[in-house]
Each structure stands twice: as C-alpha cells, then as structure tokens.
A protein has these predicted regions:
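Helix-start (N-cap) detector for alpha-helical repeat units in TPR-like alpha-solenoids
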Residues: 11-13, 46-47, 80-81, 114-115, ...
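Canonical tetratricopeptide repeat
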Residues: 17, 51, 85, 119, ...
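Canonical positions in the second alpha-helix
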Residues: 37-38, 71-72, 105-106, 139-140, ...
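Short coil turns that delineate tetratricopeptide repeat
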Residues: 43, 77, 111, 144-147, ...
Length: 332
C-alpha cells in the first residue's frame, strides 16, 4: 500500500522505468505494482500493457499475460514484438494454434530472427506443419550450418519415427543433402532418416561413402549391418557384426544381432551359444533373443529347452513365440 501511494506521485515514464528495473532484478511483485499504476494512468498506451504482460510471463502467470497482450494488440496492432511475447504465453498455455498464428505474424515482419525461426520450427513439428518445418530447417541451416543438425537432428528424427512419418523426414533431409552434399552432418542424418524409413538400399549407398572416410564409426557400422540384415544379405551382415564384436566382445545387443544372423544361416549350435551370451549379458530385446535361442535349440533336438525359451519369450511380450508354443509345446 505504501509503495502504491508513493507511485502515484510519479510520471508515467518514471513508473514504467521503475517497473522495468524491478523486473530486471526479479522483484516481480514490485514491478507489477508500478506497472499497474502506469496502466491506470495511461490505459491507452499499449506499451504499458505489453510491459506488464512481460513481467507476468516472467512470473509464469501466462493466462494474465495473454490478457495484457490482447489489450496491447487491440490498442496497437502494429507493434510486432507484442506478437512474439504473446506467442510465448500461448505456447506455455498449450494454445498451440494461436501461438502458431502469432509466430507466423512476427516472422512475417522480422524475417531474420533466428530465435523465432527455432521456435517456429519446433512448434510446426508439434503441429505436423511440415512445409513450415522444412522452411525453417532450411533457413536455419543456411545461417548456423551443421549446428542445426547437431542440436536438433535427434529430436526431429524421434518425432518422425514416433508419428510414423520417417519417409517424409527422409525426403526433407534428402533435399537438404542435395543442397549441401559436402556436409557430413547432413549425410549422417540422411543415413539415419533413410534407415528408419526402411529405405535400406539408398541408406547403404550413403554408408559406403561415409564409411570410406570414417571406417571406425560404430553407429554407422551398426546401421550398415542392420540394413544388410533387413535386405536379407545375411552373410554380409554377419561379417560386419563379427567385425564389430572383435572390438566389443561383450556387447549384449551385438551378440543378439550376430546370433540372429547365425540363426538365419542355420548354424544352430553357434546361434545357441551366441544368444545365450547375449541373454546373460542382458540385451535390450530379451524376448526376441529367447525366441531365437528356442528355435536354435529346437533344431538341435532340444525340444524341452526350446519350449522353456519360447514360454519365456511369450511372457516377455514376443507374440511370435505363441506360434512355436502351439506347434511344438502343446503340453505347455
């Protein structure tokens, strides 16, 4: 109350200055008191509403901030910065379509704002506005180069994989790669996108180029081996897995991958041994490993052990194990 009484003695400009300085210090309550006075003194001044809205954003009172920004825009629809501020408030309250409209309005006036392009790229991904996403992704790469891929590439890949749109993403990254064919970051991102889009043949073509310069990259070798496996080029896949195991002989997932190759080659004893090592080392897909080991043991004439493995596989969620149980383990 005391500050409110004193504040009334100051000019509009002084109240605004007090409010902004208090905001900078993190003293939001004092800032609001001062800016309330400024709004009351000159309610037709949009900047007072904008400034109070910004303080409310800092206070995480986003709903009240939107009210202030709405009033400011009503008073002065030509102050571009207000749309960016309201975008932030809308985004935080999950009013994504309104936020999208505001960030588009802002970038229509301030086209070179890198922060705003990053924000819109992220939001357009959330809204599956892929044309806008592409526009911002390409623009940002032209400005910040490989940092765009390194910072946001994994997030983008996860989004498209989750939404089963990997072919769309592969197409977008492919277009970017055509523009910047010398970029290793784009090429590696394109490899990942093609792999997740199940476009294994072109993925292998790019892997050949990348591995010639970077032969010891474990992630690239894994993509290569997996792509060969999915193309049913089992012997080639097995050779790559075997080579990788020389450097990481206890890698549970590599052991599982190699074991499944041995299974496809009908090397039952070796597959049994390899998958047993993988299960013992706790691979990330135990249900599939138990299924495979059960098949290897069945083909060695070890039906009892095979049935135990298939039962375990089915319990862990591998539906394909049910077929083997029904066909060979009816007593189970």
């Amino acid at each position: 109350m005391y500050f409110s009484q004193i504040a009334a003695q100051y000019s509009f400009e002084q109240l605004m200055s007090f409010g902004m300085r208090s905001d900078e210090k993190g003293d939001y309550a004092t800032a609001i008191v001062s800016l309330d006075q400024a709004v009351e003194m000159k309610p037709q001044e949009d900047i007072a509403w904008v400034t109070r809205g910004v303080v409310r954003v800092h206070m995480r009172d986003f709903g009240s901030a939107v009210v202030d920004f709405n009033k400011a825009i009503l008073l002065n629809p030509n102050r571009t910065q207000t749309y960016l501020y309201r975008y932030i408030a809308y985004r935080e309250t999950e009013n994504f379509q309104f936020a999208y409209s505001d960030i588009n309005r802002y970038l229509g006036e301030v086209a070179e704002d890198t922060f705003a392009h990053i924000q819109r790229m992220d939001l357009s991904l959330l809204l599956s506005e892929y044309e806008t996403f592409q526009t911002d992704m390409f623009w940002l790469y032209s400005k910040i180069g490989d940092a765009m891929i390194l910072e946001y590439g994994q997030q983008h890949l996860q989004h498209f994989e989750k939404n089963k749109q990997c072919k769309t993403y592969a197409n977008l990254v492919g277009q970017l790669y055509q523009m910047y064919p010398e970029s290793k970051s784009i090429r590696q991102q394109y490899i990942a996108a093609l792999f997740h889009a199940e476009q294994y043949a072109p993925c292998l073509d790019l892997l050949k180029i990348e591995l010639s310069d970077n032969p010891n990259n474990v992630n690239l070798r894994k993509y290569q081996a997996d792509a060969l496996f999915f193309l049913n080029r089992i012997e080639e896949a097995a050779n790559v897995y075997a080579q990788m195991l020389k450097s990481a002989p206890n890698d549970a997932d590599l052991l599982a991958d190699y074991g499944h190759c041995l299974l496809q080659q009908e090397k039952w004893v070796e597959a049994d041994e390899c998958l047993s090592k993988s299960i013992k080392a706790k691979n990330s897909s135990p249900a599939y490993a138990y299924l495979g080991r059960g098949i290897a043991r069945y083909n060695q004439g070890k039906l009892g052990l095979a049935c135990v493995d298939w039962e375990r596989s089915y319990q862990l969620g591998e539906k394909a194990a049910k077929k083997w149980l029904d066909a060979h383990c009816k007593e189970k």
